[in-house]
Amino acid sequence: MHIILLSGGSGKRLWPLSNGTRAKQFLQLLPAPNGVRESMVQRVVRQLHECGLSQNIHFATSLAQKDQLCNQIIGNIQYITEPDHRGTLPAIALSVLHLSENQHCDRDETILVMPCDSFVNNEYYDALKRAIRVTESRSAKFTLLGIQPTSEIPFTRYGYIFAEPPADPTNPYDYCKVIRFYEKPEPDVARTLIMQGALWNAGVFVFKLGDMLDIVHQQFGDTNYADLYSRYSELPKLSFDRMIIEKETNLAVVRYSGKWKDLGSWNSLLEETNVREMGNVMIGQDVVNTHIINELDQPILCVGTHNMVVAATSDGILVSRKDISGTLKHNVDNLEVRPMFEERRWGSYKVISNLTFADGARALTKLLCITAGKSISYQIHHHREELWTFVDGEGELVVDDVLRKVKRGDVVLIKAGQLHAVRATTDLKIIEVQSGTKLIEEDIERFEWTWE
């Protein structure tokens, strides 16, 4: 059995902590059993291990998110990288082609696809095991996990599953045949479905590899992994729920009525963090039910605030009533700003300033934080030069095949077209000033370099 964890998202509903590159599943705000803070994705992987479902875990994710996953997840985890965000159907299609061709999995292999940010307890994973058994018994082509609604509010961001009664009414763990699947219905339809006993779709799909491969070829033609990868960015954005599950007639669902929560708004997230303040924060008088998270060096002082969330990062500052924080995405859509903080496989960087001058020249200043033992790849830039000032730590620098040691106080100018790389001996901090007329992350060409 193989598990595919879907990791995507644009990070708008928890702005400014999340952004286009740091999605909500990577925010390390949740209390973990060992007393530290963990992210949603760390929590899910930990629970899979605890429940004996960690043998073959694969993340379907973007290249940018892969770096963050590598930083947060330790262990034998495999990655299926998507060239672009094209929706759940292309992501699952690319994943099953990878398992078939690159992992040499048999057509009879059972595949479990699930989100990487489900906030659940361990009973949820018992329900997953039941769903796996239903598929392995060939009782249905696809087995879904249906959540017993915990609210009569007709949420339209969920799919709804309308199912027959269990074959064995005395067994609440028995599966049910699905009568119809509704992907994100209108509010009046959702309200009726809840009254009729419909279940929320948990985004879990269990199937046999061979069945899904047949569907991939129906949807994308006579393709293979390399072919689909090469034209991935040209594919339309396609929903697996809408394109496949809504049209499939051979569906089963396993019911689950335990803890299941979408931490997609500030209000829902803060209910589970057990934190009132984080960072450089001062609480004044008459502060009630207010949460403050500050990633900036400057202090935040709150006085007389009631039922508020305040969050400050390099990307911006949010001040919102908790009860309307769920509408944040629509406002963030109107913001046209680049992410000011990004995690990479080698560490992280923070944008300090981004200037444009009268003649069109630009200067972008970053603080690079490289973890000891990690390195930035051997690369060139065609449209910019970089001035590196080493402000802390020690490392090794190579420029055009010439290797030297670097330490605090060293300053190096790297011109456009020069090959360069750096490796941190200790934790290394660099102030990088990029200069040019075209300062974009895509201006990079990588080459091989062996440090030893």
Task: List each language-model region with its residue ranges.
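Conserved beta-loop-beta/alpha segment of the NTase-like Rossmann-fold superfamily
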Residues: 74-169, 213-220
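N-terminal glycine-rich phosphate-binding loop and ensuing alpha1 helix
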Residues: 1-69, 75-77, 81-86, 94, ...
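Residue-level signal for inorganic ion chemistry
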Residues: 41, 95, 117, 161, ...
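C-terminal structural segments of small proteins and small subunits
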Residues: 431-439
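A conserved mid-domain beta-alpha-beta active-site/ligand-binding segment of alpha/beta enzyme cores
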Residues: 177, 190-210, 216
